[in-house]
């Protein structure tokens, strides 16, 4: 620890960081934890036992040893044991964490605070994923601040915050299955401040149910209500990108600190020891970057549908031939569990047709890939991490949202920010081909690239300049984490 004596060390602030146990939530929480560590906090990072095992498998047995001042701990997720190397079922996971995780989390805090056996400073704050809000009662018992990190976009969170009103207005649950396709979802909602022109179909998709007892709706109502009890709310976005939405959210929630894009903030952390701490649950394939090194600038479409999206083999084949027929270079990440219930088979004809210009891999280091000069566009599911990383890199998008608030992100990318084109959910190869060509060599693609670079520039200013909004919000957040909560 360098020059810190043990008595000085025990006075360090100690943040316990606990992400929701899915890839897209672990990544941003680890970035935030590294930033806090860099700012002088001792960190305890809490994974579930299931994901801890997956990380050891993907990153090697030494990968979670951590540092003296950055430790990894685990709690059970309450689900039956499984060795499957795939994303867990989201509704089951939400129900299980809500029901089973509070007791082991409290026991962990107790152990960390046990002066007879613990060699770490007492826990002084909790930074929890907003959908792990059971942690609030543990923080209240210890009388320490609890900050909730909503990992979606601000526009996605604003959608969730209006679920109660959607129910009150009879807009969800849907009356019957015909409402999925009869135009009902196309109605414009003019009563959500900060979301002008938003349609029902653009809001997070859990409302698209005919089941009056839909668990995910109950879960969202519970989590959005509990968010009001936090000391503060953190978002991985920036004021300039979502100003109207953030202003609207500020009337509904405790103080909000947009501190994104986190990856640009984290790039300023000059600490080699932290760089070895990674969070990819699948093994990264370094040959992706080697292959990109052989390609011209802005000549490759990066294709990745994230860690949760699944598709049918027919959809996979339509995407494949759309990419092949576009004659553009592509790097396509196909997770082992991307095709629901079966393995993906693309066939020799496709491989032969694209061997000079296509590379398929099972996972990669996305930030390095998307920042590579060869990448000219991104075919994405519009998960928020992918979207904000694309914005930070100045890369325009083709959007194929799958679920949750990905629809909302797609709407804002295409209609508000000018950096995306949506592809029909019922994907056809001709549309894939024409959109990929437009993205890479068309006029609209050029306009979107220009706009994406403008957003990249704003994102860099807001995170790197002392008067930038995200830079100063991080400083304000640290003050909250070091303060005593006001009840």
Curated annotation (Swiss-Prot):
Q: Which InterPro entries match?
A: UDP_glucos_trans
One GO molecular function term of this record is:
UDP-glucosyltransferase activity
What is the reported tissue distribution?
A: Expressed in roots.
Q: What is its EC number?
A: 2.4.1.324
User: Does the keyword section mention Ribonucleoprotein?
Assistant: no
In the record, biological process GO terms are: (-)-secologanin biosynthetic process
User: Which residues are UDP-alpha-D-glucose-binding?
Assistant: 151, 366, 381, 384-386, 389, 405-406
Cite the binding residues for an anthocyanidin.
25, 404
Q: Which SUPFAM superfamilies match?
A: UDP-Glycosyltransferase/glycogen phosphorylase
Per UniProt, the keywords (alphabetical) are: Transferase
Taxonomic superkingdom: Eukaryota
Tell me which residues this entry annotates as catalytic: 25, 129
UniProt-listed Pfam families: UDPGT
**Principal EC category:** transferase
Family membership, please give it: Belongs to the UDP-glycosyltransferase family.
Q: What is this protein called?
A: 7-deoxyloganetin glucosyltransferase
This protein's gene is called UGT85A23
